[in-house]
């Protein structure tokens, strides 16, 4: 029930004119002409429509195939939608980082779980691109120039936030000063896992000083004091429930991230084989090497120690 004096809650732009629980009232013949189809609002000359709310015009006008090939539209939309999902993943990860710094773990759990679900969407998206055959891709590949997913600055920020730091990966963005500066700040900041390790220290676990004061521009490396802390958490989960849940959220996240990488490799092998990538990398062999990267090493190693 609405408290007296409170304004009515704003209506979801996707909902109809009536509340979801409003009873259906059959309309008299001829009512549709004036009341709208099933009483839905049909005139948006003075109000915001679905397309207005979502800014659909610029989004749907952002696909500009460079080749005459029919399949290029699939290629463009696959990558554009992936960038949108990455935008959401980054949005949630930044919020999770802030929550962890503030010791507000339940909201961080929700955000990290959402990122894992976003990664599942990205995994499934490869199934759509995999409908493109090698001959179809070969017809449009010359029009791509040197552009490559390797140059995705959102993907690079995602890698940096998850702890896979590499200063050389700033170079493809030197021609975009604002993006370069943003990525450099992310490179130099503590990663998600760095903040979780700081959390372990705040909760009383003896983390080595050199780990807490690490060079944030370097990739995550295994630390025995961090593994000892996680071992204590896993041996007595009820005594450290929030940290135990955090550990499992991180494992879920890396699991989903690995699946995304693996699906990327297999899709590339299926479509282009072992040709060099458009961005100059070795293509599939480079992507296979990336499968060996471990983001949260102690959380995986502790499973053997238990």
From Swiss-Prot:
Keyword tags: Dioxygenase, Heme, Iron, Metal-binding, Oxidoreductase, Tryptophan catabolism
EC number, UniProt record: 1.13.11.11
Cofactor: heme
Residues covered by region (Disordered): 1-33
Cofactor binding remark: Binds 1 heme group per subunit.
Pathway involvement of the protein, from the record: Amino-acid degradation; L-tryptophan degradation via kynurenine pathway; L-kynurenine from L-tryptophan: step 1/2
Reactions this protein catalyses: L-tryptophan + O2 = N-formyl-L-kynurenine
One MF annotation (Gene Ontology) recorded for this entry: tryptophan 2,3-dioxygenase activity
Subunit structure: Homotetramer.
The protein's role, per its UniProt record: Heme-dependent dioxygenase that catalyzes the oxidative cleavage of the L-tryptophan (L-Trp) pyrrole ring and converts L-tryptophan to N-formyl-L-kynurenine. Catalyzes the oxidative cleavage of the indole moiety.
Protein's UniProt name: Tryptophan 2,3-dioxygenase
